Amino acid sequence: MSNPLHGNALERVAPTARTLGRTVRLGARSTWILVADIATGRFPWREAIVQAWFFVTVTAIPAVLLAVPFGVVIAVQIGSITKSVGANSMAGAVGGIAIMQQIAPMAAALLVGGAGASAVAAELGARTVRDEIDALRTMGIDPQRRLVSPRLLAVTIVSPMLAVLIVLMSILASFLVAILGQGVASGSYWLSFGTFASVTDLAICVVKAMIFGYLVVIVAAQRGLEARGGPRGVADGVNAAVVIGIVGCVVVNVLISQLVAMFIPPRMY
């Protein structure tokens, strides 16, 4: 006699597993197409540049507006802790490493996941419900080659640029708060930052941002290409793309942070 609870659980898990499989397959095939087209000179660079510029225009100013409060909050919280233990000179090191390894890549993921993913899912979803995707296939044009791969490269390039911009603005805001509001000497701030922070921390930030951008675009493209039911279906796909993309970035960030802690020990002096 079958267990009804077991059957209901399988019915709920199976669609999610199938969707995950289609997303992984879309990501693998789009990546293969991207690499192959670049190697053979068939990649539509013009489309990729247009998409990259679009992502820059919709995320650059929000990145600055998001980075400054993050830097201020980090400086206030860390400053109060370091002051209580008599280690004001360590504010630059602690704040800088936290910004580079965690704050900046996650902030870039939020921006790309909010603005970039919604734009990709909305555009591809609108084309899907208008049967433009089917028309491309009828004409022998691969939608993944024509639409997904350029956006994949564009976001993968723009995401680390946003992360670096957030790092610069957040550290600058944190520095100003530390020296103007907490009495930290500017020399000791930068000395501790330069002593404990390294190029490896910045590289981790850039790699994280690239992975997050890649993940967000693949999820958004999958939701857009599978949109059904007219405008309502497009809206549902956009909402799902944003939520799933950001949640996926959070989960991946935990995994990457654990791997970094295991295999890349911090600098000790």
Predicted regions and their residues:
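Hydrophobic alpha-helical transmembrane segments of integral membrane proteins
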Residues: 145-153, 245-264
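Hydrophobic transmembrane alpha-helical segments of multi-pass transport and channel proteins
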Residues: 160-164, 168, 198-214, 242-251, ...
